[in-house]
Amino acid sequence: MPANKIDALFVNFLGNSPKWYKLAILSFLVINPLIFFFINPFVAGWVLVLEFIFTLAMALKCYPLQPGGLLAIQAVAIGMTSPSQVLHEIQANLEVLLLLIFMVAGIYFMKQLLLFVFTKMITKVRSKTYLSLLFCVAAAFLSAFLDALTVIAVIIAVGIGFYSIYHKVASGKDFSSDHDHTSESHDQLNADDLESFRGFLRNLLMHAGVGTALGGVCTMVGEPQNLIIAAQAHWQFGEFFIRMSPVTIPVLLSGLLTCVVVEKLKWFTYGVQLPENVHKILSDYDAYEDTHRSDRDKVKLIIQALVGVWLVAGLALHLASVGLIGLSVIILTTAFNGITDEHSLGKAFEEALPFTALLAVFFAIVGVIIDQRLFAPVIQWALTFEGNAQLVVFFIANGVLSMVSDNVFVGTVYINEVKSALLSGQITRDQFDLLAVAINTGTNLPSVATPNGQAAFLFLLTSALAPLIRLSYGRMVIMALPYTLVLSIVGIVTIESGFLVEMTQYFYDNNIIMHHSAKELTESVVGH
């Protein structure tokens, strides 16, 4: 191939990404087969995981689907995993994919109601600390009953709405004008106000993101892995909440206290105030909307509110899978609000489909983790401990692995390994139940450290909002750090101090929960 053609190919490769980034991805593609075939497949597997994390960390340089996808395709091609294993992972996580496709699109059609509610909240509540706590508590409460991805989709829709309103007015347009809020070529924009507003939105989004983890860990419907763990242990909704409470309640209170402290002390880039000019624009927008709201608009808000009630009720009562409820939200809101042309419907799917494709690529990496047994040494090591020490080690081991891998996968692998240990007589049924608590809290809490562990964080990082407010991988890690430390330390202390064991015994003694037998677990292994 002529030199100019090669140059053109290199320029086209990964588009506008920096040259060093393109070279890094190409070098990964060269060294991976060499390590796999000539050094050690286990080492090659861990190298691939680290490379995939690198593509996520560089999400603002290049969307991770392309570089991560190339690594995943090569991994399948050289035999690190198989197409059937990738398909199995996608099948096992079909509900998550349906949730992304339909629920996020459904939330798009409810954004008028969301903007109405949250605009009132932001314009009326002037204390940033109280507002942050409000976002954190609201996200925690919702995530106890809804999936964290759904809650984050709501928060992202609200964030984009606020940003576009400010950007439109600051660019010299009125509220009713069409405007491209992703453009940065408007001279009228006040750089200081814009930067402060970005910081303000970053703060609220991170508080809400951590809130989803704080609430999601408490109930069996809060996170997908909670459902898997509850199914393996044969726990119902109430028993799950009670068994988790010795760890989750102290952690929840500590997390909310952390929210207040970082805001008050302005640590880790928190404490950014809403600029007065931006507050005025949002207040003016609120007044403008109230004045110009027609009967049709009011009916639209009522319809969206009624659909919102159905959404919460349907998810809390598990009337259908999350994705199907999302599809019903799309149908109900569009049918009764008169959105019937294909182009208008298509816009709703733009946000979630790239991330859905990225998640499918992520499942290929999970396939490598399974086929190369990358976590096996850690699990076997953890099982060598006994009693309370074993609970602490499982919490820490789950936490560390959940920072680099999907917490649904980590939780599923661990609960199945512990179930095998119970059935082979290595542990008692009571110890199994305590380990299930350690696994659930270990996968949910420390995983806020990076976007890798929490699908909701990864969705936020790769959303259309992240580049607008300059929310990068590194920034997310730094902003999550105080929460990571507090949630992890409090979680470890509640287990290591014996508080979990003592409270569980108290629940047994007072017949709040009952002892289970190993015979209940003779059914086939769920998940992987």
From Swiss-Prot:
Keywords: Antiport, Cell inner membrane, Cell membrane, Ion transport, Membrane, Sodium, Sodium transport, Transmembrane, Transmembrane helix, Transport. The chain crosses the membrane at residues 11-31, 67-87, 98-118, 140-160, 240-260, 311-331, 350-370, 391-411, 449-469, 476-496. It is found in: Cell inner membrane. Pfam families: NhaB (PF06450). It catalyses: 2 Na(+)(in) + 3 H(+)(out) = 2 Na(+)(out) + 3 H(+)(in). GO terms for molecular function: sodium:proton antiporter activity. Belongs to the NhaB Na(+)/H(+) (TC 2.A.34) antiporter family. This is Na(+)/H(+) antiporter NhaB. It comes from Shewanella denitrificans (strain OS217 / ATCC BAA-1090 / DSM 15013).
